[in-house]
Amino acid sequence: MADTTGRIPLWLIGTVTGIPVIGLIGIFFYGSYSGLGSSL
């Protein structure tokens, strides 16, 4: 698994999977602050 030759770089996987997670967390906190999070 350490050999990234011919595979997707680990930093690319972390970026692609990290951005949506951060976005969802941001939307969750934004919804809770605006009062929409309580309905979820």
UniProtKB/Swiss-Prot annotation:
It is found in: Plastid, Chloroplast thylakoid membrane. The chain crosses the membrane at residues 8-28. Its main location: plastid. Pfam families: PsbJ. Keywords: Chloroplast, Membrane, Photosynthesis, Photosystem II, Plastid, Reaction center, Thylakoid, Transmembrane, Transmembrane helix. GO terms for cellular component: chloroplast thylakoid membrane; photosystem II; photosystem II reaction center. GO terms for biological process: photosynthesis. It is a single-pass membrane protein. InterPro entries: PSII_PsbJ (IPR002682), PSII_PsbJ_sf (IPR037267). One of the components of the core complex of photosystem II (PSII). PSII is a light-driven water:plastoquinone oxidoreductase that uses light energy to abstract electrons from H(2)O, generating O(2) and a proton gradient subsequently used for ATP formation. It consists of a core antenna complex that captures photons, and an electron transfer chain that converts photonic excitation into a charge separation. PSII is composed of 1 copy each of membrane proteins PsbA, PsbB, PsbC, PsbD, PsbE, PsbF, PsbH, PsbI, PsbJ, PsbK, PsbL, PsbM, PsbT, PsbX, PsbY, PsbZ, Psb30/Ycf12, at least 3 peripheral proteins of the oxygen-evolving complex and a large number of cofactors. It forms dimeric complexes. Belongs to the PsbJ family. This is Photosystem II reaction center protein J.
